[in-house]
């Protein structure tokens, strides 16, 4: 009987510790928010790490990839920036800012045709969004 009580106490303690560690662990969106805060403070290495953690937590977090793409552009790592922005668009093809950023990346890489194609998609999506916003106002 003592063994069962002891076992029950140990099991309760283990479950309590597991619950506490899960509660204190950040989720993907929180890592993106942290990354943006690092960006605002010009802490680019810390921002990159936060965006990578966001993606590690949720491989479908478009904003994590988007932030990472911005960091890679800042670091002039254009191939990685291109991959990051393409990952955003694979998750959300209507992410107009990712189309713009991909176009900008292509421009920096000297790929003018690809840049223009991305900008064209950005303008189309941005126009649709602006139209919806105008409809909401009226």
Question: What kind of region is each of these model predictions?
Answer:
Residues 2-11:
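Bacterial N-terminal signal peptides that target proteins for export
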Residues 20-22:
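C-terminal motif of bacterial Sec signal peptides marking the signal peptidase cleavage site
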Residues 26-57:
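Alpha-helical segment of the N-proximal tetratricopeptide repeat
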Residues 33, 67, 101, 135-136:
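Canonical tetratricopeptide repeat
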Residues 41-53, 75-87, 109-126:
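Structural signature of tandem alpha-helical TPR/SEL1-like repeats
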